């Protein structure tokens, strides 16, 4: 991808680093990949520089960052034995297939402007649900069942490839509806995101984008790496916060972030 190293772009470098740092914290804290934050900000950057198909580049690059973040987050959570591997693998395999399918649709058929608005509506709807779901704060535990995992895998995978997210912000509300406590949902979500994100990422990496440099398909390698480096360091902080924060505060924080980013995408 051609992005001239103008003064304006140099000013954006600190923003990319800061966002990467925040995404690393959020990834470990909520069991999410951070795509809901990365994709909107990259959409703004690519639109600002007049990059054709900016939303598709934002989604593809976001999935790459999400994948890196999720791998780091898995190692962090595995150390404290906070991953439900059985549930994660079940949801992850199903979501991988559907994320590849929806990623293929975006790359080949869906208009970028429509995609941006759909993403904003999706984030706001999730924010409203999480804000109103007081009941999940009091749930202590429940037995694993296959049905919610299958539903979760289908919906998560499809939306992941569509919007460039890892799926954590989809998994947690769906599991909350199935009466899983927030922290249990986080433990499941952490193991799902690498599989979900790689499914959609393949479609964007293999897309034909002739005429650009420094990219593979719809993935901007320089920007992805700039954002990924601080994630390595900040993800550890997210784990510490996760162990200390209450389910109620965890839910409220996630709802607030989703709402703000959703409005940002609709403006």
From Swiss-Prot:
Which family does the similarity line name?
Belongs to the 4-toluene sulfonate uptake permease (TSUP) (TC 2.A.102) family.
Q: Main site of residence? A: membrane
Pfam families xref list:
TauE (PF01925)
Segments traversing the membrane:
10-30, 31-51, 55-75, 87-107, 158-178, 185-205, 213-233
Q: How does it sit in the membrane?
A: Multi-pass membrane protein
Keywords of this entry: Cell membrane, Membrane, Transmembrane, Transmembrane helix, Transport
Q: Which organism is it from?
A: Methanocaldococcus jannaschii (strain ATCC 43067 / DSM 2661 / JAL-1 / JCM 10045 / NBRC 100440)
GO CC terms in record:
plasma membrane
Task: Give the source lineage, highest ranks first.
Answer: Archaea, Methanobacteriati, Methanobacteriota, Methanomada group, Methanococci
Q: What name is this protein filed under?
A: Probable membrane transporter protein MJ0441
Spell out the subcellular localization from the entry: Cell membrane
Q: Domain of life of the organism in this record? A: Archaea
């Amino acid at each position: 991808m051609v992005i001239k190293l103008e003064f304006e772009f140099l000013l954006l470098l600190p923003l990319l680093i800061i966002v990467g740092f925040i995404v690393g914290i959020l990834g470990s804290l909520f069991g999410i990949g951070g795509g809901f934050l990365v994709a909107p900000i990259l959409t703004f950057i690519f639109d600002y520089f007049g990059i054709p198909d900016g939303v598709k580049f934002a989604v593809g690059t976001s999935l790459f960052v999400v994948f890196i973040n999720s791998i780091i987050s898995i190692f962090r959570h595995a150390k404290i034995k906070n991953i439900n591997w059985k549930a994660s693998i079940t949801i992850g395999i199903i979501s991988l297939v559907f994320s590849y399918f929806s990623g293929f649709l975006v790359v080949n058929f869906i208009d970028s402007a429509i995609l941006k608005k759909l993403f904003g509506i999706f984030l706001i709807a999730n924010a409203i649900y999480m804000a109103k779901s007081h009941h999940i704060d009091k749930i202590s535990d429940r037995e694993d069942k296959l049905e919610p995992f299958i539903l979760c895998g289908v919906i998560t995978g499809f939306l992941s490839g569509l919007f460039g997210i890892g799926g954590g912000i989809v998994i947690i509300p769906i599991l909350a509806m199935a009466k899983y406590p927030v922290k249990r949902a986080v433990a499941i979500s952490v193991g799902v995101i690498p599989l979900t994100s790689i499914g959609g990422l393949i479609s964007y990496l293999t897309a034909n984008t002739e005429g650009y440099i420094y990219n593979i398909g719809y993935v901007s390698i320089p920007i992805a790496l700039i954002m990924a480096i601080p994630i390595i360091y900040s993800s550890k902080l997210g784990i510490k916060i996760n162990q200390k924060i209450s389910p109620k505060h965890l839910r409220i924080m996630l709802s607030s972030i989703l709402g703000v980013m959703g409005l940002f995408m609709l403006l």
